[in-house]
Every structure is written in C-alpha cells, then in structure tokens.
Amino acid sequence: TLRDFLSETDWRLEASDSQNWYLHGLAQDQLHTTLLSRVCGKPVSDYLPRGRAAAQWMQRSNEMQMLLHSHPVNQERAARGLPAVNSVWISGGGVLPEARRAPFAQVYCDDPLLRGLALWSGAATDSPPHDAGGLPPGAAAGRRVLLVLDACLAAAAYGDAQQWSEIVARYERDWFAPLLQALSARRLQALELVALNGYRYRLRRGDLWRFWRRSVRWRDALAAASA
C-alpha cells in the first residue's frame, strides 16, 4: 500500500524484509532524523525530522498514516484486540565520511545499520551466537572484536525494570561470566563493557591481580554512574 502510494511521488520505497524498509529520493542533507532506539519511551514531538524536507515528510507521513489506519490488516488487528500499525518512523539516513579502517576485525550484531557500517569499513560481520560458548575458538586471539547485545534496549527505554533485570541476568550467565573466565585463563587480553548510559568499563588481565581493590557489583557501578 505505501509503496503504491509513494510510486506516484518522486520517492520510492524499498521493502527488503518485514523489519527494514528503505526510502529513496531524498537528498541526504534535506532531512535530519533520529534513530528509533533513541526515541522509544520519549515524547515523539521532541524528535521529529528536521531540515528542508521536514514539512514535505510530515505531509506525506500523515497521508501514509491515514492509509494504514483504514488498511484491512489493521482492521483485522483491531478486531483481534491487537495494536494498530498506523505510523512510519524514518531514520538512518546520512552521508558517509571518508572510508577508514574499522577499529574491530570482527563485529557480531544483528542491527542492519551497524552491520552496514562494519562492512563498509572492512570488518567481518556475523550474528551474535546464543552465548560465549558459541564464539569460534580463538575468535578474539590477537584482535579486537565487537559484540553488540541489545535485547535490553526496549526494556531500558520504556523503564521496564523487571524485564531489564531478567535480560541482564542472562547476559551475566551466558556472556559476562564466561568471558571473565576466558580473560583469567589468558584467552583474552582485555574486556570493555559499553553500557547504555555511554560509560565504558575496561578490565585488563592484570587488573584481576589487584586484590586490594574493593569489589563492586557491576549493577551498583551502573547505578552510581547514572545517578
């Protein structure tokens, strides 16, 4: 429906799959957008697109919203008591800087934007395994590896503390504890955790011998940093 609607304009919608759509026809400097992950749980009005094409986008997005509202699929969803899919959020556009080598040799993530940037900069990409045991032997031997664990993003954005705690507990069991053991066993040189609040926590192998330092639970450290 949306693709047919936009075919009558100078824009073209490409739906590569159910999760990722791409809009063609806008110059990259005409519309400045915000990633959906930064908007979830916040007032949408504070993050609406800006730029020379913002008014045009708002007009067409309103028309698309009306089309979606009356679409048979949404009527069926409403009859089943499900939320309506009645809006479109645009983000991810931009101008690539000059090509540069990635700081990571391997990137494990499912986010299409991150994977695209990794491939563009020369890094190998793959989906994250279910746990640390699924990493190939020697995956991080002598090279930097980026692992993106983002299952807790929605819970953090919407303030769902229980779900966030459950997901992070799985991270602790499946990832953090095994990777710490690998660091202690000299299979890794260092670990660096980048939290949702932007803080970085780096642990080198030699830090494990600093027994005089008082241990702090990582959850307490995150809470203190966010206070």
Where are these regions (language model features)?
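…; additionally, a secondary subgroup of soluble metalloenzymes is captured
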Residues: T1-A227
